Amino acid sequence: MKDKKVARLRRAKRTRLKIRELGEVRLCVHRTPRHIYAQVISAAGDQVLASASTVEKDLRADATGNADAATKVGQIIAQRAKEAGIERVAFDRSGFKYHGRVKALADAARENGLEF
């Protein structure tokens, strides 16, 4: 189990270094078995420009650990990023496979106007 986590963190580190070289704003996703979190982080990496998660009051009432919840988080993060004036982001999946909830969040964000 520990090796699996270490490998994921290694993949995440490599991705973040590449995104930092590009100097783009990034959409960072983190998932746990119960919740999913999304943040739009500045190019310098020192400021969170927008965030959304299943921990928020309006999403907490429904199921929080499934693809439907991830889709709702994707829609909300795209809307909040647009309000902050952000149209284009680099997708940081934090070493997680692009599948299931991570994919659902990314697809919903794309459909609601964010460019990756």
UniProtKB/Swiss-Prot annotation:
Gene Ontology CC: one annotated term: cytosolic large ribosomal subunit
Annotated organism of origin: Alcanivorax borkumensis (strain ATCC 700651 / DSM 11573 / NCIMB 13689 / SK2)
Name of the protein: Large ribosomal subunit protein uL18
Keyword terms, alphabetized: Ribonucleoprotein, Ribosomal protein, RNA-binding, rRNA-binding
Family: Belongs to the universal ribosomal protein uL18 family.
Keyword rRNA-binding (UniProt): yes
Subunit structure, interactors included: Part of the 50S ribosomal subunit; part of the 5S rRNA/L5/L18/L25 subcomplex. Contacts the 5S and 23S rRNAs.
Annotated function: This is one of the proteins that bind and probably mediate the attachment of the 5S RNA into the large ribosomal subunit, where it forms part of the central protuberance.
InterPro entries registered for this protein in UniProt: Ribosomal_uL18_bac-type (IPR004389), Ribosomal_uL18_bac/euk (IPR005484)
NCBIfam families, per the entry: L18_bact (TIGR00060)
Keyword Hydrolase attached: no
GO MF term (any one): 5S rRNA binding
GO biological process, one term: translation
